[in-house]
Amino acid sequence: MKLILRADVENLGRLGDVVTVKPGFGRNFLLPQGLAMLASDANLKAFELERKKLQAKMDALRTAASDLSAKIAATELVIPVRVGENDKLYGSVTTAIIGDALAEKGVDIDRRRILLDAAIRTLGTHEVRVRLHADVVATLNVKVVAEDKVSDAAEPVVEAEPETPAE
């Protein structure tokens, strides 16, 4: 089945590409989602007229994703977790937990956009990638701390200057 892509599709092609896909993938996913249209002569002509609008829309999405990427890069999440002996985590830190913590910071991102190779199972600072757009991937610093040490991690300790006795 030959289709014209109306948006960038990961592992398939970019906006305007004419691709050949299996009929089930085209009928069940690409066409209903509005990501593609059948590649006929009439649709090719119609797409050329629509291409500039779609390209402007894609550029706006890319710009918004870049702005959000800068905001995410400046954010450091502190996630408190329960730990047992030898600082071993009970459970792990997953994309859902990271997504909820980001939402609390005012950055609303679908948890499926958070890319973790494996769940985080150790204390410390971890770099987590967030795919915001096909071309934009942000890096987020996630600091996993023990629950009883949350106040230490959230607020840096500032030592007071020693007082000199007044004479």
From Swiss-Prot:
GO terms for cellular component: ribonucleoprotein complex; ribosome. GO terms for molecular function: rRNA binding; structural constituent of ribosome. One of its GO terms (biological process) is translation. Keywords: Ribonucleoprotein, Ribosomal protein, RNA-binding, rRNA-binding. Pfam families: Ribosomal_L9_C (PF03948), Ribosomal_L9_N (PF01281). It comes from the Bacteria. HAMAP family: Ribosomal_bL9. Binds to the 23S rRNA. Belongs to the bacterial ribosomal protein bL9 family. This is Large ribosomal subunit protein bL9. It comes from Nitratidesulfovibrio vulgaris (strain DSM 19637 / Miyazaki F).
